[in-house]
Amino acid sequence: MAERTHACGKVTVEAVGQTVQLKGWVQKRRDLGGLIFIDLRDRTGIVQVVFNPETSKEALEVAETIRSEYVLHVEGTVVERGEGAINDNMATGRIEVQATKVNVLNAAKTTPIIIADDTDASEDVRLKYRYLDLRRPVMFNTFKMRHDVTKTIRNFLDTEEFLEVETPILTKSTPEGARDYLVPSRVHDGEFYALPQSPQLFKQLLMVGGFERYYQVARCFRDEDLRADRQPEFTQIDIEASFLTQEEILDMMERMMTKVMKDAKGVEISAPFPRMTYADAMARYGSDKPDTRFEMELTDLSEFAAGCGFKVFTSAVESGGQVKAINAKGAASKYSRKDIDALTEFVKVYGAKGLAWLKVEEDGLKGPIAKFFGEEDANVLMTTLEATAGDLLLFVADKKSVVADSLGALRLRLGKELELIDESKYNFLWVTDWPLLEYDEDADRYFAAHHPFTMPFREDVELLETAPEKARAQAYDLVLNGYELGGGSLRIYERDVQEKMFKALGFSQEEAQEQFGFLLEAFEYGTPPHGGIALGLDRLVMLLAGRTNLRDTIAFPKTASASCLLTEAPSPVAEAQLEELNLKLSLKEEK
């Protein structure tokens, strides 16, 4: 078999007159009665191959048997197309290949999905036949983008003198957040490894080990409820460094992301990135990962609501809640009563009891709650919300967390529906000064807002024992267009501070020693100050490639139920395998 001389998408007018050897898949076959045209595809693109009896009867006879997705080896001569046959939509649209020989390397059944960017296949079918789905150019281009992003990051970190170090996949189960995936040990009866949720502890131990600068393209595993932007196994760019301040880490990440955007996407972005505290983000956007590509910020009306005539507002404030509103500029005529009812049902998903609304008309406020506001109150509302005729005012009165969640989500929905979002923008943002701990009323205990190894502000360390809810974290999240790209922090590196953190989280001294004794002991051998960040590679690629589903950036992803439709994993295993592991199944009976 002759070697391939050209990739299909790279045969240009410079090759006219040359004999070329091409290999690829049949994208399309057209029989024009005596002439057969085949679009031959490989990962670089498509080239048109012509089978003409005047050139080769033998090649034409073979071409008559060829169908879509057959794998071919074609030998032929490159010729220029006639003036009326030029296709400027193709890189190879000015030439075609007159076939002199063709060899069918492999035949193909009729594929269950159309191999084209615009496929009509359902996602389940695409996942079941993922190897066919990956043939679509849009999928290849996504993974080329992923490769380019990863290569740029590796090159950047190499110039910054970081070492790429692999950390264990089989490790110890520790209570860090989500459920662990467990792996039974054959050698140690009744004991289990866990797949890592992140390399957090190992990268800190590498800092104890004096490596100073580490990174890893790390596989992580979390057994949690899945959403469109979550997978049970995912990849993060894991970075840790000793002796750097928070400012130095943020500056380095800005330089890295600027290079990624330029090299992998061809987009120039400016640094430093804007910064916003966690409290400010929640107050203004109702989200800890705000999309700043459009306005429509939340406005706090609690002070006004406390003295107004609308009892729903006043009672919310009196019970310790708040009232906030968003002004959808010029949207009054675009939302009917039925549309607003749909918005009301939408905010209820986020815990809101309802959605109050007003439309601003030339002669004042109109809507179900307009009667509760006299002229003076109406003027205050209009002024506070910067409202003018044609605006739609939307209010939620409830607990602070419910107000933030519901209005934050409503803001994003309105931004999309009103086409306020400039999709060409890439708005990076740092969200800083996070709370260190969050209180869970159901569990009646504190949980780490990020993870238990985050360093509090020095002046807040004592609050861990007196008022944990007031302690602030030296933590930072990188946000892009309303998505959390990653999170990081300075880490605790002193045993006494780490023990105070564990105590605030409800660990007894014995529990802390049992779970994290190896880390606590490591802190007694001269641990340097250190910090880092972990960036979600899958999510970053999703945003840069313009995809809407994280699964499109992972070669062989899982479904929302954490199953693989291609391999049918997870699956039962043989009884003999369980016996080797000294395991017995005790399945719950279906009710």
Curated annotation (Swiss-Prot):
Keywords: Aminoacyl-tRNA synthetase, ATP-binding, Cytoplasm, Ligase, Nucleotide-binding, Protein biosynthesis
Binding site for L-aspartate: E176, R222, H450, R491
Coiled coil: none
EC number, as in UniProt: 6.1.1.23
One matching Pfam family: tRNA_anti-codon
Aspartate, as annotated region: 200-203
GO molecular function terms attached to this record: aspartate-tRNA ligase activity; aspartate-tRNA(Asn) ligase activity; ATP binding; catalytic activity, acting on a protein; nucleic acid binding; transferase activity
SUPFAM superfamilies assigned to the protein according to its UniProt record, in alphabetical order: Class II aaRS and biotin synthetases, GAD domain-like, Nucleic acid-binding proteins
Reactions the enzyme catalyzes: tRNA(Asx) + L-aspartate + ATP = L-aspartyl-tRNA(Asx) + AMP + diphosphate
Phosphoprotein among keywords: no
Site (Important for tRNA non-discrimination): G84
PROSITE patterns: AA_TRNA_LIGASE_II
Enzyme class, spelled out: ligase
InterPro entries: Aa-tRNA-synt_II, aa-tRNA-synth_II, aa-tRNA-synth_II/BPL/LPL, Asp-tRNA-ligase_1, Asp-tRNA-ligase_1_N, Asp/Asn-tRNA-synth_IIb, AspRS_core, GAD-like_sf
Keyword Ribonucleoprotein assigned: no
Main location: cytoplasm
BP GO annotations: aspartyl-tRNA aminoacylation
Residues annotated for ATP binding in this entry: R222, D223, E224, Q231, E484, G536, L537, D538, R539
GO CC aspect terms: cytoplasm
PANTHER family: ASPARTATE--TRNA LIGASE, MITOCHONDRIAL, ASPARTYL/LYSYL-TRNA SYNTHETASE
Family according to the record: Belongs to the class-II aminoacyl-tRNA synthetase family. Type 1 subfamily.
Biological role stated in the UniProt entry: Aspartyl-tRNA synthetase with relaxed tRNA specificity since it is able to aspartylate not only its cognate tRNA(Asp) but also tRNA(Asn). Reaction proceeds in two steps: L-aspartate is first activated by ATP to form Asp-AMP and then transferred to the acceptor end of tRNA(Asp/Asn).
Complex and partners: Homodimer.
Protein name per Swiss-Prot or TrEMBL: Aspartate--tRNA(Asp/Asn) ligase
Gene name as annotated: aspS
